[in-house]
Amino acid sequence: MSYPEKHIALVCNPTRENEKALGIANNIEVLLSGIDIPHKIFTSAWPESFDSFTEAWIIGGDGTMNWFINQYSEIQLPLALFAGGAGNDFHWMLCGNETTEQQVDHVLQSSPQLVDAGICNEKLFLNGVGIGFDGAIVHDLLGKKKLAGKASYLLSILKHIIGYHEKPCLLELPGETIKEDCFMISVANGKRYGGGFHVAPNAIINDGLLDVNIIGKISPIKRMKYMPVIEKGEHLDLDFIKYRQTEKITIHSPGKLHAHIDGEYFHTVRFEIDILPKRFSFLY
């Protein structure tokens, strides 16, 4: 099959810990060269724009993808994401467990599909925002070498699951206000984060909705008991969880809360989160 109209930018995670992503990028480059598709690879330096390309293929994890959409927030080109990070949760939403070779073949034959993005305090995300306990987990992992999949996440959970204290929160949704001491709040566009925790099993990336899970006060014993249930995405009917679907949510707390956005740590006292329907175009 011929692809004369294509000119693909291969964009690789520009960090010191990008050996996996570089290896995948080199593999993709070989595959594209073998079928004579014009392309250019970007590693340590990314261009100001991709206007001279027909597609941008990003090789990295959720953090790399998040950095890309915030750096190129108005990009109209079709995008593809290849799993070159530790968790790769958004990639899983798009492509499941495809190999690189399978995905290249699949992407080359795909038509662009529009997917939603979220925005939290003026920063875009694709996967979700985690506030409270899982934000504390991401904070604990700062500066540490990440293990593949959810191994790093699990180890940090075991370290903190007993001693973490719920934080007072005020949550405002259209037509509803919730005041509660919260162990954890997830506001998701995708189904999972943390390298495989299915925090929002009903989430769909093009339905124009955010999936919100609010976990209130929960004893240490219950935390240990139900964390595997949350990992599997079987938690929505538990009595200590409030589940909502919404287009927007605002969350306040008297003190700064640990949080992450697509796995990238931040902390604040106020979160303003909205869905941006059909914001980006992806090949999958």
What name fits each language-model region?
Residues D134-I137, K179-D181, R192-G196, P220-R223:
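Short acidic/glycine-rich loop or secondary-structure boundary segments that cap or lie
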